[in-house]
Amino acid sequence: MSKYRLKVGAARKDVTPLPSMFPFKQADLNGDGQYTYARQAIHLRAVILDNGVKRFLFLVSETECGNLHYIKKYAMEKYGITEDYISFSNTHSHSCPLKAVYDPGTTLEEMNREVKMGEFGPESPVQQNEWDYGKYCFEQSIAAIDDAVANLKPARFGHAEGKSYINISRDELLPNGQYAFGTNPERPSDKTLSVLKFVDENGSMIAGIINYAVHSTMGFRVKDKDGNMAAYGDLAGEIANFVEEAYAIRGEETVVAWTIAAGANQTPVHSFFHTYHPDGSWEPDERYNHYLGGYMWKLSAHMAARQGNDALKVFDSISKLKENIRIDVAERYLKLPATKVTNWGLPQLFDDREIDDSKMHNVDVPNQFVYIGLKLIKIGDLPVFCYEGEMMVEIGMRLKEAAPLKNLVIVTCYQPAVDRDLHDRFHGSHYYVDKWGFENHTPSYGRNPVKDAITEEKVTEAMFDMFDEILNPDI
């Protein structure tokens, strides 16, 4: 048998909250909003690559699942997957329950004894339904890994890029010169649609991975005609479902995972419907306790179908597939100095009109650091760069241009499954702005935690170092 002969297995599991678990609290922005039901199934997907030398696990979820440290430990102990050959990520859907908290090493009561600090102060205690949902997601993650291993079969691998036009920059420039969340066709936007395709010996697709830079924010402020909010996988989930259903119609049962690229400041093209007045005043579409109607769900389905068809074209364009695939991995953990933006908090989050650029500036936070996990995976000739957190599209496009290998795929919202005592890495939703965003106070500036916006510089250095480790292992 040839060295590095590839086998691939995949599985999809339903992680929709059970009816008894509702209601769930929604985002702080939504005030009293709660999810009271699910309008579509929420999924997680596992894809395992085995080339006879190493196994690699991709676990992609439409919600943040369970305790990744214990999921990693399970995959390592039962299936011999080494720690660095495991990648967890989420699609960054804004329409799933905020908390899926579960730790098999403790109890709910013990977890709540310690008050955790969030971005805007102490976090609320974990509720029983959040714990139960976390346990369910944890169990489904384990089941997905088990099934993916059981489904391993000889495979071939190919990849390609295309274009999709459902995203736009959300750094909107207002008439008063201030930037706010909105839409801006003049700012950079990466239309690249990358796909990874794994087929069996008969040419049927075992699994696919889609990568694109856009937020799944279509449904998180929607109330139906009865005034209820619904959980679902949002835009990312609808795209994955569309492609899987298309292959099912062809007679191919496949698993398709959608991943978010460098899309921190990329919004769906049909989103943000601000109200502008002739006197120059305006009302932001996204503000506290302001809800939209079910038409947002229709727009989401429309864009999902558009990108679903785009993805099918790219998948179908792949004619060169290889069966002998080497897999190499390098990891880094960055420790960067922290900063805090003054005059930024919940009032500014709740209403962009409360932002006063003249009063916002950075102050150092002594002895505090921001940790960013990075992973570079080389699958055959394809580099995949995993990044913890949200990456601005400008940074992503420059990384692609600079990378030593072509067709760099950037997977953000990557979640390193490090031990809890290493550091507290889930203490807020952060945007790592570039120098331009830092200097111009784009909407993401207020939530940038890294001093002097040095993230891009340090990530670029680390990426080159990781490429060097993989491409020149004997030096």
What positions do the PLM features span?
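Conserved beta-alpha junction segments in alpha/beta enzyme cores
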Residues: 1-255, 259-302, 308, 315, ...
